[in-house]
Amino acid sequence: MEFIHQPYYPGETIAAIATPPGEGGVAIIRISGDQSLEVAAKIFSGPIFSYRSHTAHYGQIYNSSGEHVDDVLVLIMLGKRSYTGENTVEIHCHGGSLITRKVLEVVLAAGARAALPGEFTFKAYMNGKIDLAQAEAVQELICAKNEKALGAAESQLKGSLSNRVLAFQSTLTQIAAILEAWVDFPEEGLEFATMDELDQDLERTAKDMEKLVNSFHNGKILHDGLSICLIGCPNVGKSSLMNALLDKDRAIVSPIPGTTRDVLEDHLRLNGLHIKLSDTAGIREANESVEQEGIRRSKKAMQEADLILLVLDAHKGLEKEDQELLKQVPFHKTIVIWNKIDLNPRNLPCLEVPFLVHLSAKEKIGLEELHQTIDTIIWQDGPPSKEEILITNVRHKEALIESIESLRRVKIGLRHQVSPEFLTLDMRQSLLELGKIIGTNISEDILSAIFSKFCIGK
């Protein structure tokens, strides 16, 4: 079901369970809309209309037949002081799938409509409580996988990204006004000093926007986590290294080549980041069909991974199959690992690779060096600070890139004395793209795609 394509009426009253499904001490049913109090009054034992905003009251819920359903606490939030900007009632009932569903059914029978995914946050956006970037931050807050991602989402929810976009818009609006005046009063022309100032303002703003675009690298890592793939020939110790990184026996370790036939995945936290770790089948020339399929999947996992750990056997040294693998991996995202250094290998060849680590997965020697090397590759310019504004949403990145492209066209146009009518068109387009980020100019299809990702009840 598409969200925005449903008829939307600002005063329509909606309801949904706002807490996760399953058993628990307390569950919350949220009601929001102009008729929230009227709906609650039909089913709650207390004098709903006499309650002040942001007060909680104990009472009972009854169905239309007068049968007792549950003892509850009701929380009243009136008008603009609520999350949605509309009258809101929260019913705090006993947790558990059955009782929670029964209370919701009573609420819906009293006149509320079942909420669509993200509809409460959509109401908050429509009622001016938050802009679109802040609305998206709500979802990112819920889905945050680590402390840094949580901090970035909180910052965006408080308006850090929105304020930066508004600052860009303010500067560009002033430039657009000058260009519009040039169109309206061509006989006045533009002073060369003004032309130079415009060029400088455009360049400075474009560079500031590019910094924000470049923050997407770190933002995406915080938001999505990182996928790391272990590859290598059979019996080089990939499974042992996976177990060492996970600090548990997840993969079967065997001296028999080809034990790992499929991609084995697990998750861990490394320096606060969410990591998906994949152990793959040993890559070699194989005749058996099942092993061939495992090798094909290994190569696919290698291509899709954010980071590759290419494991070599230090005891055996560099073999022909290892050399072939070294030719296939992209070194900018590959750490080459000499494993089994506990066996005192001698005369290891010097490998000219950017990232090289010596360790023993079996004895857990050198793991800290591996952690540090992973950090070095992940954070190209160092980890982000708490104060840094990051974009974590590809939609924001694309809008900024389009806005910058329009500014570049204006700069080129000024340099080549292009008619101001064409320059103003590009300025408007740049502002239009920025407006997409905070929702001042956005299509219904995009809104539908954004809010449909939310859970029901948020």
From Swiss-Prot:
EC number: 3.6.-.-
InterPro entries in alphabetical order: G_TrmE, GTP-bd, GTP-bd_TrmE_N, GTPase_MnmE, MnmE_dom2, MnmE_helical, P-loop_NTPase, Small_GTP-bd
One of the GO BP terms on file: tRNA methylation
Superkingdom of this protein's organism: Bacteria
Residues given in the record as GTP binding sites: 235-240, 254-260, 279-282
Family assignment from sequence similarity: Belongs to the TRAFAC class TrmE-Era-EngA-EngB-Septin-like GTPase superfamily. TrmE GTPase family.
Protein name: tRNA modification GTPase MnmE
